């Protein structure tokens, strides 16, 4: 049981920053709501889905020492007892070259989150197709598909996954 909890904590912390950077304007709320995160690269050792809630957030003062002015737009990701805040960094020109048309990504620290048309390939020279139109990637985790939940707190989706 401790291994499963550790996995959930690791995945939620790794993906927290990743997920929260998908849109330049948190108020547009394209990421706001309940999401199911599923690592797609089974060879990297992380399996299983976790449920998270993403909400816009504005830090007023003492904003975690992130060297940004107070009141900078951020996302807050909550999963279980974990909460994480993040902010945006635009991706480099070299990173943009690797994307197919219609996809836009943002990086935060060493991760990125991308948004585009569902059912299309976001990355040039990659076979991965995003089912939902949202995905994240990180060097040590690989690709994580983001899927919007239909039930409150993703409970029905998690139950269906855990029974298979």
Swiss-Prot record:
Cell membrane in keyword set: yes
**Which sites carry lipid of kind N-palmitoyl cysteine?**
23
Cellular compartments annotated: Cell membrane
Entry annotated with the keyword Coiled coil: no
Coiled-coil positions: none
Where is the secretion signal located? 1-22
Principal localization reads membrane
Tell me the keywords, alphabetical order: Cell membrane, Lipoprotein, Membrane, Palmitate, Signal
Instruction: Give Gene Ontology CC terms.
Output: plasma membrane
- Lipidation sites (S-diacylglycerol cysteine): 23
Q: What is the membrane topology here?
A: Lipid-anchor
Name recorded for this polypeptide: Uncharacterized lipoprotein YbfP
Source organism of the structure: Escherichia coli (strain K12)
- In the record, what lineage is assigned to the organism producing the protein? Bacteria, Pseudomonadati, Pseudomonadota, Gammaproteobacteria, Enterobacterales
């Amino acid at each position: 049981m401790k291994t499963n909890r550790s996995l959930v904590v690791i995945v939620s912390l790794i993906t927290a920053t990743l997920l929260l950077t998908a849109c330049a304007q948190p108020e547009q709320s394209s990421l706001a709501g309940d999401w199911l995160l599923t690592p797609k690269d089974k060879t990297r050792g992380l399996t299983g889905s976790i449920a998270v809630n993403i909400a816009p957030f504005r830090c007023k003062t003492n904003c975690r020492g992130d060297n940004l002015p107070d009141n900078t737009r951020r996302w807050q990701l909550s999963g279980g007892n974990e909460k994480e805040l993040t902010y945006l960094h635009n991706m480099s020109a070299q990173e943009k070259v690797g994307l197919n048309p219609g996809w836009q990504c943002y990086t935060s620290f060493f991760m990125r989150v991308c948004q585009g048309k569902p059912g299309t390939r976001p990355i040039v020279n990659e076979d991965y197709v995003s089912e939902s139109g949202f995905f994240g990637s990180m060097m040590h985790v690989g690709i994580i598909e983001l899927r919007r939940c239909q039930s409150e707190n993703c409970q029905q989706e998690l139950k269906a996954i855990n029974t298979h």
